[in-house]
Design a protein with these regions (language model features):
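N-terminal cysteine/histidine-rich coordination modules
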Residues: 1-86
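Residue-level marker of intrinsically disordered, low-complexity segments enriched
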Residues: 4-7, 12, 116-118, 167, ...
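Generic structural signal of hydrophobic/aromatic residues within well-ordered alpha-helices
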Residues: 6, 16, 69, 73, ...
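Arginine residue identity/basic-tract feature
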Residues: 24-25, 35, 46-50, 67, ...
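Generic detector of intrinsically disordered, low-complexity, polar/charged segments
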Residues: 31, 44, 108, 129-131, ...
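Histidine (H) residue identity feature
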Residues: 53, 57, 66, 116, ...
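Short flanking/linker segments adjacent to small metal-binding domains or redox-active Cys/His motifs
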Residues: 82-140
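C-terminal, charged low-complexity interaction regions
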Residues: 126-180
């Protein structure tokens, strides 16, 4: 049975699977990577790659809104990391990540798991052989740097596209109102 604090969180419509996993690890409720650049004016966080309004309003989002953001972020990780790490063994990667007590959502994508494994290796290169990534420890830093460059470019392009769509819709609505 969950503790009283967890019950309170649950009463605020946070799904149980976001709070406790089957082995009592606390699941991540936010994609935050601990280095938010939106506080300095970035439209896209350089850490988690959420849009600035998503960072600001995250705690007010519904479970469905959270899921939509997670899916976009995971799709971006898949698009960048899966091709960068073609020799990765996902079973070993997942076992490695879980052995380091990294919190993963049950629906975490292959790219999300690769991201956490690469991040662990970037901080501790001696983990590389056990990570399942299929790379040499000397490849970690160049791969991490290339990943960071590509993922931020993709996230920024995604933000720009969303902004252009919203602007186009608003311009269309203004035009319709002016005609009436």
């Amino acid at each position: 049975m969950p503790c009283e604090a967890v019950k309170q969180v649950l009463n605020k419509s946070v799904p149980l699977e976001c709070v406790l996993s089957s082995d009592r690890r606390i699941a991540s409720l936010t994609p935050c990577a601990g280095r938010c650049s939106t506080v300095f004016g970035d439209a896209v966080c350089r850490g988690c790659r959420r849009f600035n309004h998503e960072v600001i309003h995250w705690n007010t989002y519904s479970a469905e809104q959270h899921r939509a953001v997670w899916q976009r972020l995971d799709a971006q990780l898949d698009q960048i990391l899966v091709p960068l790490l073609p020799h990765a063994d996902l079973v070993k990667v997942q076992a490695f990540v879980l052995s380091k007590r990294v919190r993963l959502r049950d629906d975490a994508s292959k790219g999300r798991k690769l991201y956490h494994a690469l991040k662990l290796c970037e901080k501790n290169r001696h983990f590389t052989d056990d990570s399942g990534l299929g790379i040499h420890y000397k490849q970690v830093r160049p791969l991490w740097d290339e990943f960071e460059r590509r993922i931020l470019a993709l996230a920024t392009a995604s933000y720009d596209l969303a902004f252009l769509r919203a602007d186009g819709i608003s311009q269309h609505l203004i035009h319709i109102q002016e005609e009436d």
